[in-house]
Structures are given as C-alpha cells and as structure tokens.
Amino acid sequence: MVRKFDFLVIGSGIAGMSFALKVAHKGKVALICKAGLEEANTYFAQGGIASVTNLKVDNFEKHIEDTMIAGDWISDRAAVEKVVREAPAQIEELIKWGVDFDKNEDGEFDLHKEGGHSEFRILHHKDNTGAEIQTSLIETVKAHPKITVFTNHYAVEIITQHHLGIIVTRYTQGIKCYGAYILDEKTGEVDTFLSKVTVKATGGCEAVYRQTTNPLVATGDGIAMVYRAKGVVKDMEFIQFHPTALYHPGDRPSYLITEAMRGYGGILKTKDGKEFMQKYDPRLSLAPRDIVARAIDNEMKLRGEDHVYLDVTHKDPEETKKHFPNIYKKCLSIGIDITKDYIPVAPAAHYMCGGIKVDLDGQSSIGRLYAIGECSCTGLHGGNRLASNSLIEAVVYADAAAKHALSVLERYDYNADIPEWNAEGTMNPEALVLITQSMKEVNQIMEAYVGIVRSNIRLIRAWNRLDILYEAPARLFKRCKASRELCELRNMINIGYLITRQAMERKESRGLHYTIDYPHADKK
C-alpha cells in the first residue's frame, strides 16, 4: 500500500510530537510510533528541562558556560547559544500545550539544580517531568485533525535514489529522502510512505547495552537507517552512562534515580557509609555525569562490588516524599525506604550524545531529511551532555526544523517512481531463536568492551565479534520477510559497530570517552 503525507515524522517523543504540532497547520502529518505513544524515551525522563527563567540570579552566559564545560569544550558554540537563548520561548510553547511545571508558594517556577549547573534552572513536574510532557503532547496531538498517528508501525528503511536503482555511496552528492518503508506489525505488511519532508525523531540507542535506563525500544533505528542510506553520523563514541540507576538485579531497563536527587542533597557512599567523591572532584556528588560514573565504576572495581549507595536519609522525610514521590514508591516496592535506607545505585547506559549530524536547522546530510532529539547530533552536547539539556534541545530543534521545512515545502513533491517493498520471504522459529540470542550477544559485547572505561584491546575484540554477528542477520534480511525483531537486530549491530569504530578513531580521552591507552585529552 502507498500512503502520501506532506510530513512523515518517524518517532513520537517530545521532538517528533513538537515538530508535528508546529507544521500540521500547513499539511498532512503521519506520526510513526514503533510501539505505544507512552513508550518514547521522553516518558521516562525524570529530572526536568533546563532553561534560564530566574533572571535575578541566572543568565544565558552562565548556562552556555556550564554546557561548554560539561561538553569538555568540544560542543558547537553556535548550537549551544541557539538552544540556551531560544529555550524560554519553547518552555512557553510547552505550557501552551498543557504541560504543568511545578511552582513554589510565590507562583514562580520551583527550580531544581543538577550536576554541572551553576544555578537552579531545572523546571520539573515532581519527579516525572517526561511523563507530564509526553502525556500533554499526546492529548494535543490526538486532538489535531491533520495529524494521523500510526502506533505499532516500524520504519524499516528510508527511501532514497538507491531504491530507484541508482548507486549511492558516501561520496554521492545530492542524496534525497522520499519517505520510508514502514512495517505494519498488525498485518505484517510493509507499506510505502511517500512524503515531501521526512523527520527522524527516533530517540536513542542505549538498548544495545545490557544495563540501560532506556525503554528497550531504544535500539538506534533512526541512526542506523540514515547510516545505511549513506548519511553522516557523528560522535557515536560519546555514550552517557547515568551514574545512579537503581541497582536491582533482574530489572531491565534499570529504574533511573534522577540527578535531581543529588542536587537535592543526596550523597554518594560506599557500603560502609563512607563518602568517596572527594577523591575524584571538588564538586563531589554534583560533578558532571562522566566524572561521577567513572568514580562509581572505579569504586565498584576496587571493592569488587556491583553497586554503591546514594544517601538522602539526612533530609527531611516529608520533603523527600514530596519531591520524589515516584522514586519513593518504586524503592518501597522492593523493600527500601529512602527516608531511612541507602539507595543501591550503579551506572547504566542512558543517553547518546552523538547521532545523525545536522545543521542549525536540523537538516541532515541527506536532502529533505531532518533529525531532531536524541537521534541527532547538533553539537550541543560535545563530549558530554549537561543534565536536563536533552528535552530542551529536542523542542528548540523541532522548532528550527519546522520553520525550515515550512519555508521549503512548496519546492518538493512526491516521487511517483518509488517501487513498493518486495514482501517475499518467510520467518521460521529457528531464525527467531538466532535473532534473540544475537541480541543478547550484542548486549554482552557492548557492556564488556565498549563501556565506561575502554582500551584498544577491548575495542578490537568488540569490533571482531560484532563483525561475526553481522553476517547472519544480513543473510536473513535478504531471504526472510521483514520483522521488527530482525530489523532491530540489524540496527543494533550497526549501532554497536558505529560506537566501536568512532571510539577507536578517537585517540584521546575526552568527555564520556575514556580509554586507558590515551588517558589524556588532546589539546591541539
């Protein structure tokens, strides 16, 4: 089946839904969601969204400086200035769409402070800001007559000249995107979605790691598809490991203990109740995430333990319950009263700072294709993302991409020559077993060899094992009917390869990329 839309938005988190709402008055929008609308990464973001709002003590220059420091001075300054200066207007837009940020007794925003921030500037809704934003946007999107939501639809490939029989390489000029082939999981058929403009808002890729705070749908689909289509992908070595995921064996994904809990006064301690962050950074538990994650990783290895602890027992119990009601309930459900007990925590893969390279308008290297949100690489994060800068980046770049797309929409039309998907092939139980086991192997490889601390030997081993793993799904994809499981495996191996290759290419330790073979930053 062939479907035609002015705008094809693949991904339904804060970035995808914001873009859809900003362009829907000018054309028909298809919003593709690989699972349910609530399963986007946005829904699971706890801490909040960063923006300068209290001008009595804060200003843009401070937020810019904090972002550059966290990014280890390799962030794109233009991207940083854009996001920081345009943030307040996008906060107003979110409020207009129904998002309810917490206020204090004076009616002003109740601001949190998180690691790496010099001021209180984190807007939040209790300790489930992402869920509040996602729920508000879902209601607004569903009410819009020009936005059609396709749940349980999975993007298999973006459509370029390659599908017209033209050879496309990484040196081909003028690659263009004409839409995407989308698998309807209900029917098992792959439909052809033609569009004038296509937007990737597919989120992150942290499900390639065994320990992750991300929903397991975060398999890097958008990044992998654009890479295979010969688009530019950048900074994949910079995987952020959140320092404080709840340690509870068997949980996958891991439950996130928000950064805001350390901003609130939480202290990292060893099993015997001793503080340790003073050995690593003068900012103690409020140091940027890469420093805290490496410190925890080192303490765990020194002691042969699986976790450390976060202590908020010295804080007022009622205040703790008020600020962190969901964390309180979650921990209580496994027998931990955070007002009396230490919280067991360990690092887990949390955020991809790199992705599909885009310009200040969110345009990728492929014409008519934009990338926004976590799947994109705007340059904002550099070597490490500052806490709570991701949600604001998503809405600022959704706005930029929407404005640019609307300004060029009339130049584009549908490409009527695109062939429909070749649906031949079968899927047998043996193939499904192979896929499931291969996914587990990818998780094990990435966790063991491409984690918080890396080395040349570990990276080479990961490369070789991923290379072996790639052959089977590549053959299966040619002879089997397309399925979500097979496509996800192929994407996960592509993502593992990209992270490993770009980590091997960076001959220094910088931001989130730390290698024992090159322990210092190259200051050239």
PLM regions: where:
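Short beta-strand to alpha-helix junction loop
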Residues: 75-88, 121-139, 150, 212-220, ...
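Rossmann-like flavin
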Residues: 70-110
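Conserved redox-cofactor binding core of oxidoreductases
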Residues: 95-189, 194, 201, 245-248
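An anion/pyrophosphate-binding glycine-rich loop and adjacent beta-alpha core
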Residues: 225, 231-338, 343, 395, ...
